[in-house]
């Protein structure tokens, strides 16, 4: 399991083994800014007589219904390019300006407006002459979740619902979203917080169908 910042997962550990101390290990990996050495996450002590406990045979049913989005129902396709510019102008102390669609975060700017009830497909890529191919970024969006359709050429299992996903270098990630909830302004951003805080974030506005656009 590769977890980007803000990813969550659940797993079971089967304790049906000899008594002793067992370690849960985080494996070494080198996914750009997620690079880390192998380390012990925790130690588990198994003791006493074995217990006869049945293990689940299937995943639990979701507690939230998220109907899948059909291609013919997609209202709009958007592309978000995560990149950077050297040397940093807005962030000279960092040395790089982090950008989405070649734009650094502006508090009052709302470059993306979506209509409540619409279903959209977003293509997420890492780009830029200096930035592309050197690192990935975890995309996180507020207020809604998305279905992951493809990571590169690999189609994902139907119903893979997330709100944060790692965009590997040189790879396009395709997601679909249904915009439900209430009107208002919110954000999406890179969840490596120093990247977010130095520009890799954008506002987007949810509006009622046929209603005025205020921001």
What is the role of each PLM region?
Residues 138-140:
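Beta-strand signatures of extracellular beta-sandwich domains
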Residues 7-11, 161-165, 171-177:
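Short strand-edge motifs at loop-to-beta-strand transitions and within beta-strands
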Residues 1-5, 149-166:
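Solvent-exposed beta-strand/loop surfaces of large extracellular or lumenal domains
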